[in-house]
Amino acid sequence: MEKDLKFTASHEWVRENGDGTVTVGISNHAQGLLGDVVFVDLPDVDDEVTAGENFSLVESVKAASDIYAPISGVIVEINEELEDSPELVNEEPYEGGWIARIKLSDDGDLENLIPGDQYLESIEEE
C-alpha cells in the first residue's frame, strides 16, 4: 500500500493527484471482505458528489456494497476498464481497480481522512 493514501472509516481510499483532483477506490481490506467482484456501478462524469454519500456500488459474489464519496466534488473521470474487468478491484485495489477521479470542491475534506498508517492499525483491531 502506498504511504500517501488516505482512507475513510468505510474503507474507501483517496490519492491526491496534485492537480486539485483525487483518485478514489476501495481498500484491499474492503475488497477482501467483499470477495470476488463481479460488477461495479460507476458514477457518471460531471456528477456532483458529497462527502459521506454513496456514489457507486460494488457487487460481489457475496454482497453488494455502496461506495461512499470520501470528499465532495465533481466526477472528472471514471475507470471504464471496470465495466469489462470488475475483478481489477480485487487484483489491483490501489492501481487498476480505482473507481473515479474527483475534482475537489473543498480541500478541507482531505483533513477528515485517516492517514494510511492509522487506517492499517484500525483494521488490524477489527
UniProtKB/Swiss-Prot annotation:
Species whose genome carries this gene: Aliivibrio salmonicida (strain LFI1238)
UniProt-listed InterPro entries: 2-oxoA_DH_lipoyl-BS, Biotin_lipoyl, GCV_H, GCV_H/Fam206, GCV_H_sub, Single_hybrid_motif
Chain positions with N6-lipoyllysine modification: 62
Keywords: Lipoyl
Superkingdom assignment: Bacteria
Cross-referenced HAMAP family: GcvH
Name used for this protein in its record: Glycine cleavage system H protein
One BP term from GO: glycine decarboxylation via glycine cleavage system
UniProt xrefs under Pfam families: GCV_H (PF01597)
Cofactor(s) it depends on: (R)-lipoate
Cofactor note: Binds 1 lipoyl cofactor covalently.
